[in-house]
Amino acid sequence: MTHRILSLAALTVLELSPPEMVEVAARAGYSHVGLRTEPATVEEHHYPLLRDKALQRQTAARLRDTGIKVLDIEILRLKPLTRVADFEAHLALGAEFGASELLVAGNDPDVQRASDNLAQLCDLARPYGIHPHLEFMPWTDCPDLASARVMLDKAGRDNACILVDAFHFDRSKSRLEDLHTLPPQRLRYAQLCDVAGPRPDDMAEILRQARQERRFPGDGDCDLVGLLRALPEDVPLSLEIPTARLLEQGVSAYERARMALEKTQALLAEI
């Protein structure tokens, strides 16, 4: 059995409120969760954790009662009109919950401006003990591992990291040999799932799969063993595996979370 941190990502059980998510994570056998303080899209179902003080208290109580820890918070986007100072409330709340990692997306075509904002965010996050992780995604302005590395180099901050998500790594055609060259301190956690079938030509279909139709580890076609061997040993894993089909079939959040964990543990036994 691995002693690696395994965290339940919000997207896996997005229908749950943060306190419910903590409870499901504890029942399913996780050690950590990830919390969304900002929705990924305007359409998604979202609980206003950042503004709802009662919800914050309920979440803190569940964390205390279950012993579950918070690994990361998400998702902040670097856009052309971003004011980095506006992100401080997210950092303060994340630190209050004990999070050490922050998920950041690059949604600005001006690489220098985006890198400057990433540098400012790293400076803002440092007193909170939080490490911003730039997550590359094929449909964003930071579409692959190489692009993320360019932004980190331009930002020039030692607490700036890259978040490798198995789905995006596969669909962006990023390369394991490039991952091997990254300093391990730039890879403080990763997101795990599996992916079925070849890369679609349609970016809208890639986006749909990313948000609705991932696979549990071992149920798809990714070289997850190779990916995990390229990452730092025992790097914490956030299990981000949305499965809309199972949700529509009535499979509970607990059952989906448990399946994700069991499949991941089976995969890790192969490493």
List where the protein language model places each region.
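Glycine-rich, proline-tolerant flexible connector loops at the mouths of alpha/beta enzymes
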Residues: 34-58
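Active-site acidic/histidine proton-transfer and metal-coordination neighborhood
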Residues: 20, 62-69, 77-162, 171, ...
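Histidine-acidic metal/acid-base catalytic patches
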Residues: 1-10, 15-32, 64, 93-98, ...
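Conserved beta-strand positions in the central sheet of alpha/beta enzyme cores
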Residues: 34, 72, 103, 133, ...
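Alpha-helix-loop-beta-strand connector modules within alpha/beta enzyme cores
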Residues: 50-71, 123-127, 222-229
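Surface-exposed, active-site-proximal loop segments in enzymatic domains
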Residues: 41-50, 76-91, 204-211, 215, ...
